[in-house]
């Protein structure tokens, strides 16, 4: 009797639904739809890292604004 091996699954990072890893062209997402939704979120800057802004000295913040 052959043992049936369950395919490895993981939660989709976008919707959380279980998704099979092997043979999934959209991995780590469960579908092309979740993949494109996530791409759109990156493009519209929905994902941001929290940072602590450094105090400004009153000058502009761009490197072009500083004198050599």
Swiss-Prot record:
GO molecular function, one term: zinc ion binding
Family: Belongs to the DNA gyrase inhibitor YacG family.
Task performed by this protein: Inhibits all the catalytic activities of DNA gyrase by preventing its interaction with DNA. Acts by binding directly to the C-terminal domain of GyrB, which probably disrupts DNA binding by the gyrase.
InterPro entries: DNA_gyrase_inhibitor_YacG, Znf_NHR/GATA
Region Disordered, annotated ranges: 48-68
GO biological process per UniProt: regulation of DNA-templated transcription
Keyword line: Metal-binding, Zinc
Keyword Zinc appears in the UniProt entry: yes
Subunit structure: Interacts with GyrB.
Protein name: DNA gyrase inhibitor YacG
Keyword flag Magnesium: no
Domain of life from the UniProt record: Bacteria
Taxonomic lineage from the root: Bacteria, Pseudomonadati, Pseudomonadota, Gammaproteobacteria, Moraxellales
Residues at which Zn(2+) binds: 12, 15, 30, 34
